[in-house]
């Protein structure tokens, strides 16, 4: 037997797959043009067609708070268990949370 690879995207076959009508690399421009402010709540929804600024699969589906901006990416603070994590995520992988 050969040892299975343990890359950054291992075990993401179902998590990072798109439905047939969603396929293609370009996300909706309305999602990219949203300007998030510090304190805004966002959902982390990974777009698997865009690899830049993609968070790890463990953060897919989590909700966090915008702290600031660094370059084109946003600094997002989330709670994972009893720890607070700081992530740098590009807007292609963020959705505004409805308050």
Swiss-Prot record:
GO terms, biological process: translation
Keywords: Ribonucleoprotein, Ribosomal protein
One CC-aspect GO term: ribonucleoprotein complex
PANTHER family tied to this protein: 60S RIBOSOMAL PROTEIN L21 (PTHR20981)
HAMAP family: Ribosomal_eL21
Protein's UniProt keywords contain Ribosomal protein: yes
Pfam families: Ribosomal_L21e (PF01157)
Protein name, entry field: Large ribosomal subunit protein eL21
InterPro entries given in the database record: Ribosomal_eL21 (IPR001147), Ribosomal_eL21_arc (IPR022856), Ribosomal_eL21_CS (IPR018259), Ribosomal_eL21_sf (IPR036948), Translation_prot_SH3-like_sf (IPR008991)
Annotated family: Belongs to the eukaryotic ribosomal protein eL21 family.
Record-level Gene Ontology MF annotations: structural constituent of ribosome
Classification via SUPFAM superfamilies: Translation proteins SH3-like domain
Organism expressing this protein natively: Staphylothermus marinus (strain ATCC 43588 / DSM 3639 / JCM 9404 / F1)
């Amino acid at each position: 037997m050969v040892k299975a690879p343990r890359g950054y995207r291992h075990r993401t076959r179902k998590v990072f797959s798109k439905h047939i009508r969603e396929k293609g690399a370009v996300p909706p421009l309305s999602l990219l043009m949203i300007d998030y402010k510090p304190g805004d709540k966002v959902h982390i929804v990974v777009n698997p067609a865009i690899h830049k600024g993609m968070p790890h699969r463990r953060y897919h589906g989590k909700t966090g708070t915008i702290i600031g901006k660094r370059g084109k990416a946003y600094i997002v603070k989330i709670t994972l268990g009893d720890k607070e994590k700081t992530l740098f995520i590009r807007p292609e992988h963020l959705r505004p949370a409805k308050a």
